[in-house]
Amino acid sequence: MKVSQILPLAGAISVASGFWIPDFSNKQNSNSYPGQYKGKGGYQDDCGDDYKKGYKSKTYSKVKPITSTDCTTPIQPTGTTTGYTKDVVESTSYTTDTAYTTTVITVTKCDGGSCSHTAVTTGVTIITVTTNDVITEYTTYCPLTSTPATESTPATESTPATESTPATESTPATESTPATESTPCTTSTETTPATESTPATESTPATESTPATESTPATESTPATESTPATESTPATESTPCTTSTETTPATESTASTETASSTPVESTVIVPSTTVITVSSCYEDKCSVSSVTTGVVTISSEETIYTTYCPITSSITIPVPNTSTPAAPGTPVESQPVIPGTETTPAAPGTPVESQPVIPGTETTPAAPGTPVESQPATTPVAPGTETTPAAPGTPVESQPATTPVAPGTETTPAAPGTPVESQPVIPGTETTPAAPGTPVESQPATTPVAPGTETTPAAPGTPVESQPVIPGTETTPAAPGTPVESQPATTPVAPGTETTPAAPGTPVESQPVIPGTETTPAAPGTPGTEATPVTTQPVSVLSTSQVVTASGEFSTVTAHSTSIVASCPEGGCVPEGQQTETSPSVPTNGPEVEASSSVLSIPVSSVTTSTIASSSETSVPPAQVSTFEGSGSALKKPYYGLAVAALVYFM
């Protein structure tokens, strides 16, 4: 590094660290004094006096009783001395604490249009603060204890003159209640000290200057305990009155009925405040509770008596904040992704509007948490005979819209509970529909996919607006919790007989998206506004999704599948286990009819399996078969015999 680069860097470091090269020259600068040097600790002159850093003028924080100081400083090693004179301006800011005396004040309390006057003997502490030739007197009235000679509670926390707000905090006797104190602690009487400020040029009383004849109810029972001499008066938030239910009215100087001056020591000393733990007794309706409070301690010692004042610690005030639990954001629409049949869907948290998409048969959908208003739309599918419809619970305003599908004979319809308008949606015969709980408005949107018989659909939880999309047959739907007004709109998809449809929980708008079989879908967390997805109109798939490998050869195609489903249907060509149905392009068509038969067996279209088509059956070169994997939980368990059965079936077809 070059020298030209080192010097500026060193200079910057020196300035930043506050290090100054001592100046021992005899030249007098504008911001320094003869023989004075600057260091990290502040200023120090030749007389050995240390001053705070930052006082560069002739005014020092130290108070000098004299106006000039002569000192000699050896400047050269030869012993020559040079005399200098420094001007020290006496500080005009100081605080004087007078001795502790007693007086009798009158405390006026008003409640319900009646006022009561109580004479209380209190201690008086007068603090005189002089700031820039402005004299301010603070008179603090503190409750006395039964043993004033040993312990009392005057408020005498003094603030240095440099602070704009003198500390004059008074804590009621209840905050310093020793075991031997006879502090009045009743529901009708409260000894609340009044802090008063009487400056020479301006008078700023404590938090409230309330004369004896005027009563100001204190809503929080906080006595006036801190006074600012200038134009502000800051009440002490830590003051704990004896009685929590009584009103506090600070008394001003005019409320003193009699003033008894006791022996006043000539001198008093204020010791630096410390902290201690005292026991505070709070009484309400003849019941008292004891709590420990950490307070500041100011000890005033005189010739004969030591007065200890317990003052609140303002620097460590802890304001209790009500617990704010952050529940799942209610009213947030949640968009559920489709669930594969045989899948258990966990709905979004309660209070979240969920958009229900159609559920594939065999799927069990759990609705969103309760508390969301649900809007039920009428089902447009006729109800098969023998269907039992249960209307919404009573007390729930339901907007009934006409069902566009006739109800099959033999259907038992249960009307809504009294006082609850219910809109009945047609249910396919054999279907048991349970309406949303009372008090929850449910808006059901028509399901675009028919629900297979024996399907039970579980709607979103109550309190969440649920928009029901079509449910695939075989699905069990559980409605949302009651208490939400339900607006039933007709469902556009017929419900298969034997299907039990449970409406969405009241109050939770849930829009369910179609669920693919075999998939367990967890809906998006509540509180996230989601778009309303349009239900998929895919044909219901009654098989569990599995991973399938289709191998094409010159003569036949082999399908290896792993599935945990049970054979549910047997087409003309034979029984195919659920989860093995595949829509295949003819991979190795040996002849046209076989290919058609092979594809006709798989009536359920599966878009995730694709194979390459060979132009003619005579070609021997077969391209590698494409392998596609279904998204589902069925691929976890591998059972080879299912694959062999499917392969044999395809081979014979």
From Swiss-Prot:
InterPro entries according to UniProt: Flocculin_t3_rpt
Q: How is it modified after translation?
A: The GPI-anchor is attached to the protein in the endoplasmic reticulum and serves to target the protein to the cell surface. There, the glucosamine-inositol phospholipid moiety is cleaved off and the GPI-modified mannoprotein is covalently attached via its lipidless GPI glycan remnant to the 1,6-beta-glucan of the outer cell wall layer.
Return the annotated region ranges for N-terminal cell-cell adhesion domain. Answer: 19-146
**Record's compositionally biased regions (Low complexity):** 145-267, 341-353, 361-538
* UniProt-annotated stretches for the region Disordered: 144-267, 324-540, 572-595
Family membership noted in the UniProt record? Belongs to the PGA18 family.
Residue ranges, annotated region (15 X 6 AA tandem repeats, Ser/Thr-rich): 147-254
Q: What is this protein called?
A: Cell wall adhesin EAP1
Query: GPI-anchor amidated glycine lipidation: where?
Result: G632
User: Taxonomic lineage of this organism?
Assistant: Eukaryota, Fungi, Dikarya, Ascomycota, Saccharomycotina
The organism encoding this protein is: Candida albicans (strain SC5314 / ATCC MYA-2876)
In this chain the sequence repeats are located at 147-152, 153-158, 159-164, 165-170, 171-176, 177-182, 192-197, 198-203, 204-209, 210-215, 216-221, 222-227, 228-233, 234-248, 249-254, 326-345, 346-365, 366-389, 390-413, 414-433, 434-457, 458-477, 478-501, 502-521, 522-541
GO biological process entries = adhesion of symbiont to host; cell adhesion; cell-cell adhesion; single-species biofilm formation in or on host organism; single-species biofilm formation on inanimate substrate
What membrane topology does the annotation report for this chain? Lipid-anchor; GPI-anchor
